[in-house]
Amino acid sequence: ISAPVHILKADGGTLPLEAALQQPVEAVFTGPAASVLGIEALCAPEVNSISLDVGGTTTDIAFWENGLPLMARKGATVAGYPTAVRAFHMRSIGIGGDSRLHKTENSYVVGPEREGPAAAVGGSIATLSDALITAGYVHFGDEERAQAAIAALGGEPQAEARKIVAAAVEQIKTTIREMLDEWAKQPVYTVNDVIKGTEFIPQQLIGVGGGAPGLIRALGEAMALPVDIPAGAMVANAIGAAVARPTLSAGLR
């Protein structure tokens, strides 16, 4: 194949490879941006929504209002530092289907390390996917292997699995609360912002990615929100990369 190469940007646009080499910072958060574009192509949310792309290692979270993804008003933040790079208002956290499980005195911490394949599909140690299977949120692979891996952590398998899922859900809810607080503290730039305010009240969850069906269902129960997993959700990221288009900006003086 002889074709020009374009790199996805954090705002969902693309730029030529040559330009990306000159401005590599524009390529931050390209994976999460592809997921946002994929969701827009698959379902175009009509109500205020929180989307979550759940992979094996991370979960990418974005907000939607009036069918459009919210943009980070101060640009992308990397490791706590503002970059002024135009980007969606999103956050990536180290929780996914293959996340390692850390047992504490009374609960669990999920991630951020990736353990590897779930026991249900041939792995040797329990992961979040095994907990979701054992707790009945999703069904795939060898469910007996998943239950045995959870049992090896100690305690009754279903009870332990529910603890693990609850811990993952609480970690995600904490991140969502932080994102909501961050958005509410953003400066207002338009008359509409002054009139309506900047408070964002989610009305549904949208799940995409291989780990979405089980985890988003559990999160929806905890947040008392309906859940939408659109057709094609497993490949939303690839769809987003395919529909991306070039974007340009110009400064006027």
Segments predicted by a language model, with ranges:
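Short acidic, Gly/Ser-rich segments with clustered Asp/Glu that frequently serve as metal-coordination loops
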Residues: 56-57
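Helical "lid/coupling" subdomains associated with nucleotide-phosphate turnover
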Residues: 23-51, 60-253
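Acidic-glycine-rich active-site phosphate/pyrophosphate-binding loop
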Residues: 2-18, 210-222
